[in-house]
Amino acid sequence: MGRDNLIERLKREAEEQYRIFNQKFVLTNRNVMLGVKVPKMRSIAREIAAGDWEGFLAGYGFGVGNAVQMAEIAEQLNRDERCRTIFFEEVMIIGMVIDLINVPPSVRLALVEQFVPLIDNWAVCDVFCGGAKWVGEPGRGPKACNRVPLEQVWEFLQRYLFPDVEECHPQVESSGTGHRREYGGENPQGCSEFEIRFGVVMLMSYFLVPEYIGKVFEVLARVRKGDYYVDMAVAWCLATARAKFDAQTQAFVAGAGLPAGVLKKYEQKVRDSLIMRKRGSSR
């Protein structure tokens, strides 16, 4: 599916009232929103992932193929410049396709690395992270064998969790480059706010397990805070951890010296979670 065909289809699926409603909650300064609901975007993404997904991603400047090579920095920036003009729904579908395709771990992580700079809002971030079912230990079956092990994903995420720390940007097999990327302010809210959120939401989605919970707390204590969408992600992650590791989470929060704003958001999310549980148990 080429871009022109995709846009034509998205416009057919768009709902003006939904666009007006959604724009109140999803702030994206880079991309215009058409108003297509997520289930319809997922349906389109599945069609693309089952067909010529390489041609689709290449049309947006992604380096794809059997041996994925990251674009040079200048080419990467040119791609990001082009992608400033695409619709919000296009970015969503690009992320969904990357989540859905069945590719080796090195190819997957190289595509993710190229995708993350396009994230400039919580919706794209959270939908992409929630759909990353490729995270996990390899298992049986043609798709399970291409999962990316937790340890490999953990190391990969460090560059996003700590974008200002040089040692968190190692040369890795997945990207084929040792360059630390400089985005020149492509993200209107700051080039690292949504990179950090991406890292935190990935931790929340896949690393709240006994083997990693201690390391997750260490990261949440160190990660740079102060940006609204980072603080919200940290609070969300802690509230989710509270439901799984109650005593450990409470002990961490009590001694971590978290900013007052993060604590307030965390406490609100815990209260909201308790309310929802009570409602569910009363049905």
Please describe what each predicted stretch is.
Residues M1-E167, E173, H179-R283:
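Alpha-helical scaffold domains
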